[in-house]
Amino acid sequence: MSLCSPTHSAEMSLFLQGPEEMLPLSSEGSEMGSEKEQSPEPHLPEEGEGGKPWRVDDSEGSWIPPGEKEHGQESLSDELQETHPKKPWQKVTVRARELGDPIAHPRHEADEKPFICAQCGKTFNNTSNLRTHQRIHTGEKPYKCSECGKSFSRSSNRIRHERIHLEEKHYKCPKCQESFRRRSDLTTHQQDHLGKRPYRCDICGKSFSQSATLAVHHRTHLEPAPYICCECGKSFSNSSSFGVHHRTHTGERPYECTECGRTFSDISNFGAHQRTHRGEKPYRCTVCGKHFSRSSNLIRHQKTHLGEQAGKDSS
């Protein structure tokens, strides 16, 4: 009598294909080479038609006659025939993925940002970006320029800065001797000396020294401001203005003066402050010739001349 006995594994059941001979028994009634004490063998039913053995239904633990399929194994046996050709004495392991069973995998969401800054609550999708951001709060600036010693919190900012040392500045202002890499930058700078603001907004009348600045301003009249502060509800027409404003809520001051250590949230104020150390006063009043380090101070000063002129006209 032969028996096809399924055994269990961690993946799926193992099936014996082909006949299996019963091992001869020793004089003590145990199989050769096995343990001496064996559990009593279950009672086997008589052989079915053609001398074929009955088999154990693995799912229910009952005996089934030859020729019939086990419960729930109709599709399994078909797949075994297709993917695993029958060979005598071959054990076939059927894995769940071979049968097309779904295997759950954790999904990675592209917009998931599980790393949170403990200082301001901003979220990031990886620890590297979080560490770079946290340098704003800690003031850490590990990337140092080899030419001038200036330090930066990001390596990309240091690389951008080092290009300044590599590029020559051919265009020099005759008024203050400041040099520029592009002629257009020199022209814009000279307009500041003259107090000229040739680009005027046709809606509100505000004037600007650069056409690009006028274009940014003009959008505030024509388009709804798309950048809205979630803290106070104030809206802005461009991301740079929104970024400067948002730092007033977070307290971030990423621009640090290397001379005195003073920090600023706005790069324009930072640039104006640095002129005080260099003694630069590029903004000149065309009426009295007085110079200023900030364009806003020049405009405020020029209003005094307009007031004097208005007083003369009234008298």
UniProtKB/Swiss-Prot annotation:
A zinc finger (C2H2-type) spans 115-137, 143-165, 171-193, 199-221, 227-249, 255-277, 283-305. InterPro entries: Znf_C2H2_sf, Znf_C2H2_type. Keywords: DNA-binding, Isopeptide bond, Metal-binding, Nucleus, Phosphoprotein, Repeat, Ubl conjugation, Zinc, Zinc-finger. Residues 33-58 have a biased composition (Basic and acidic residues). It is found in: Nucleus. Belongs to the krueppel C2H2-type zinc-finger protein family. This is Zinc finger protein 691. It comes from Homo sapiens (Human).
